[in-house]
Amino acid sequence: MNEPLKPRVTFDDVSPQEPQPQLRAGLAFDEQSSTPFSPISREEEVPEEGAAEEAISAALRPKRSLWRRMVMAGVALFGISALAQGVQSLHNAWVQQDWIALGGITAGSLIVAAGVGSLAVEWRRLYRLRERAEERDMARDLLHSHGVERGREFCEKLARQAGLDSGHPAIQRWQASLHETHNDREVLELYARLVQPVLDTQARREISRSAAESTLMIAVSPLALVDMAFIAWRNLRLINRIAALYGIELGYFSRIRLFRLVLINIAFAGASELVREIGMDWMSQDLAARLSTRAAQGIGAGLLTARLGIKAMELCRPLPWLDDKPRLGDFRRELIGQVKETLQKGR
């Protein structure tokens, strides 16, 4: 039963050396140079406004160049010279008792003073719009703050700007929910959930109504020029209403900042062929077959009006969006439903 022994196997003492991989130099990271990671949803990964609007905004944004500073300095010097010349002419007319020249100089001075006053009012309104952006940045900081007292004062200031007094039901619910242990972040979150939706609901209602009116008007209007004029008028009115809801009074220059997106709507209303092609892609084949070309154009114009309203809300709103940002798809479903009802009534 003894098995034969296997032959001996001799191994070399030195095994062949495998090539060692070359290691890269180590990298040291600290907390200051590291970038915090926060996961985002797929909807937030692609901005809803689109790259076209960002390109237009970048193109229309004024650039502070050397030539512009030289022009501003020249205008300021010319204004000072004109003011000095006016004072000298007024003095000479008074000394020489030239009453006709004195009356003309006085009238011109009143007109210039009115113009300067209008520019001062416009600058104040533009500063108010820029201040709203600073308030939004402050709100972002408070949402990450664990301090106390600042959040409540900030929210009470926003309520006064919006015209909400202490007797408003939303303000009373917010004040009843506050506790001494709440920090700034918790106070601001309560305000965003109890008080801010009062204004947001009104703004959404204005957007829905303007988008519906634009849709129906474009659908029945036979002239492209009428379409463009109607879209421009409705969009300007929508901007003014949204700004007034959030306690902002728009002037000429401050309205220009929000008017940039109106240009997209005007161009959209004039490009009828492009509207027809894009409108057919937005809807299902069954619904597109039942709609006319003008109805498809109306839905497209209504969607861009809704997008303009969402952008105006974002610029006029004092708080950043938490999880209640309006989506274009919500307004799209409303517009398609209204077009369906209109077609059914017309039969």
Swiss-Prot record:
Tell me, in one coarse class, where this protein mainly resides. Answer: membrane
One Gene Ontology cellular component annotation?
A: plasma membrane
* Domain of life from the UniProt record: Bacteria
Cellular compartment(s): Cell inner membrane
Tell me yes or no: is Transport among this UniProt entry's keywords: no
Question: Segment Disordered: which positions?
Answer: 1-48
Topology in the lipid bilayer is annotated as: Multi-pass membrane protein
Keywords tagged on the record: Cell inner membrane, Cell membrane, Membrane, Transmembrane, Transmembrane helix
Q: Which InterPro entries match?
A: DUF697 (IPR021147), UPF0283 (IPR006507)
**Which residue windows does the record flag with biased composition (Basic and acidic residues)?**
1-11
Transmembrane segment boundaries:
70-90, 99-119, 213-233
The UniProt record lists the keyword Membrane: yes
The family classification in the record reads: Belongs to the UPF0283 family.
Cross-referenced PANTHER family: UPF0283 MEMBRANE PROTEIN YCJF (PTHR39342:SF1)
Q: What is this protein called?
A: UPF0283 membrane protein ECA1987
Annotated source species:
Pectobacterium atrosepticum (strain SCRI 1043 / ATCC BAA-672) (Erwinia carotovora subsp. atroseptica)
